[in-house]
Amino acid sequence: MIAFSTASSCAQGRGDSEAGDFLLQLIKINTSNPPGNETQAAQYIKSVLDKYGIPSEIFESAAGRGNIVARLKGSGKARPLLLMAHLDVVGVEREKWTVDPFVGVIKNGYLYGRGASDDKAMVAANLAVFLQLHRDRVPLDRDIIFLAEAGEEGTPKYGIEYMIENHWEKIDCEFALNEGGAIHIKDGAVNYVAIATTEKVPRGLIVTARGTSGHGSIPRPDNPIVHISEAVAKLGTWQTPMRLNDTTRVYFQKLAQIADPELKSLLENLNSSETQTVMRQKYWTEYSKLRTSIVPTIIKGGFRTNVIPGDAQATLDVRALPDENIPGLIEEMEKLVNDPAIEIKRTLGNERPASPPSRLDTALYRAMEATAKKMFPNAITMPDMLTGATDSSQLRAKGVQAYGISTPKTDEDSRRVHGNDERTSVEGLNTFTQYLHDVLIAVAAQNH
């Protein structure tokens, strides 16, 4: 059993139970990206909003790539808050699922389906809270804008980038509340709440080795396969320098308070080379939060056994710290490889912008922190830097203070995100809906 707090004003209405119904319907709409097909999901949301007389608009960036926006008006005393989540999902390997990923199956207290966690659970919770505030006629000091966007899974030009470039006036805001972060469950209870205030920046690099093509029976010193293999081995095992920022410094200090004895000892001695070696071997996520990471993901070269190719390539997934100097990083990589046959270039396209972390002293961060303490009194709350990427990065680049939080998850639940049998706890979704409701009341309602 997982113990959640249920003390929330939202629980007195229908918002929490509605979220599960909305999620079921959204899972049934296949928005795998590519191709996306988010307009169909946006039309479903519009039909729900229409029932309550809430005006909404769908903006298509391309055929079928819909983004939907709605607004609850406030007094204008404070600038708007953007309540956002993305409609698209990653694809599936159907044969590896034990349930149909696009039906929405509930068993043993979990709702299964693609997007059950990332990110249709947040779409559903946002919609439920948005409707609850409307039904309760909550007087607001700031507008609350609902956005469900396309293209987050690798094609933000169809979603958040399109909305910023073409319809910024529809989503212009002071704060954004998005996916990311964590409500982490251990031994049946929430032990920490991590609020995402920044994220690592994805950068793609292509490593190319060039040589002389020829017959495979004659070994050549400039064989591109050999050179690319040696370069990838060096880059893939390079321990880049450790560097803390304001977010990760607080994150690791607080994580040490609840960590097991081994991890606690490591976190208290981060500067030790022995610590970094152990973290690389056992604590991969924490290791990645400490540095810019370089991960080889694709190698291409050759087309038949008896032919030495003229070139070979490797793709590197670089997740850079927000303040990383990418040209300087490439120079360091070239020095490390030290091979004139190797060229390292940055790929362009679908990159997220680097931007400063969101502050820890804003009204929204304080509301998220206070609500977490109220609902999960035995848990610690801390800021977090995501190793992955979200649409918050584009908003932070516009000066928006954007924060991320996600539905409650165990480690097993987290492992299923983007994987097989993705799921979310029904009880956890209800609790998450209550959490969002109380955060919005604290930061947007009058007399709070």
Which residue stretches match the model-derived regions?
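A non-catalytic alpha/beta surface segment that caps or lines the substrate-entry region
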Residues: S32-R79, T98-V103
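N-terminal hydrophobic or amphipathic helices/low-complexity stretches enriched
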Residues: C10-G36, V48-P55, E93-K96, E199-V201
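Active-site metal-coordination/substrate-binding segment of hydrolases
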Residues: A78-I145
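Fold-level recognition of mixed alpha/beta catalytic cores in primary-metabolism enzymes, strongest
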Residues: A116-T292, D421-F432
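N-terminal signal peptide c-region/cleavage motif recognized by signal peptidases
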Residues: T6-S8
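Short amphipathic alpha-helices in soluble, non-transmembrane regions
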Residues: D222, L329-V337
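An extended, acidic, His-containing surface patch that forms the Zn2+-binding/catalytic region
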Residues: G76-A78, H184-K186, P241-F303, G310, ...
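Second-shell loop/turn segments in exported
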Residues: K28-G36, L111-A116, V193, G214-P219, ...
